Amino acid sequence: MGSDRLIYIRTDGNSKIAAGHLVRCLSIAQNCLKTGMSVCFLLSDEESKSLLESFMTESLKENQQLSVQLLKTAKYNDLEKELPEVIELLSAGHSSYNEISSNVYLLDSYFVTKRYLSALHPVAKIAYLDDLQLFDYPVDLLINYDVIPDTARPSYEAAYQNAKKVLLGAAYTPLRRQFENKTVSIKENVSDILVTTGGSDPYHFCMEFIRKFVTVLALPGKKVQNIPTLHIVVGSLNEDKESLYALSKEYPFIRSYENVTDMAALMGTCDLAVSASGTTLYELCSLGIPTVSFTMADNQLISAKAFDNTGAIPCAGDIRKDREQVIQKIFDFIRQMSQDMDTLSADPTSDKRSASYERRLKAHQSLRNLVDGDGAMRIANELKQL
């Protein structure tokens, strides 16, 4: 490890809790390395390790300032079980309290307990990534990157009285490095639309959306070049995978993608996006892609509502409750944002911009103001100052 400060990052990812914790922690880790810190990931099992390494570039795997360690006594859903091992690890090689307290320990787990945090406090500076507000966390640094309307900010601040310092709001969103400092321009016409449901699509949204798209927009006789291209991101657990690829062969304006390595580049080619709520909304926000969201799981409801309340990303509703209404609202959004639906000037030489272009430009600026892609570096700088 390097001579600068060492940060331990305790997190996990597996088929039960997905990979979101690993992805956002890796983004923070990469920025910690930029600041001169060394990083040690502490994981529960080989599954978490394999998942983490699948997100790492070869150069990152070879970086001597980053290491990955499996805890022998850990269970991802029972953190207190590992306490003796973690305390021994954090205390090893230190002869004084000042040396011990120079450790930085970032935790990202929904299975945190007050006892776990309190037990570690004497041997490290503790930081915690939160989005559930389970209790008032006794930590040195609390990070919650929810989209928080001004009216809700006081209640968030009141919920974290035991934290010595609190970082609140979307400015602290830890996005993947591919989204850092990336900008896109708003085109005059809508020619490309991104559609994504995340890793799975249990309610067959993509298939329903495409059927509606073909029926409503791809009307018989309409020139193919005037139809926006649909870019469908096919998650690894999508049960309709084969059907979606078949539709891509049948219709030239439908393209399906799987295992996308540079999502920022794909998003950057699109003028509009339709997305299930979740981390993807923050990524689209950072690029300024006008987006409409929908929900299909309980843990997506709060995020979708928060984006909707700020006016940044409207939510069409919950696909589980009223599929037809949700899809109709999504098409209303596409119409509103597409030039085809505007009443344009009768003068073909007019350089007046379309109303839909102005709406997309306004949305782009609003989204970029909310999430700029530098959240992980802001967190890294705060961790180094602990």
What are these regions (language model features)?
Residues 10-19, 24-31, 37, 44-60, ...:
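Active-site and donor-binding regions of nucleotide-sugar-utilizing enzymes
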Residues 43, 273-275, 290-299:
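Short hydrophobic beta-strand element within catalytic cores of glycosyltransferases
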Residues 139-203:
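A nucleotide-sugar donor-handling region in carbohydrate enzymes
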Residues 268-279:
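Acidic donor-binding loop of glycosyltransferase active sites
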Residues 372-386:
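C-terminal alpha-helical cap of glycosyltransferases
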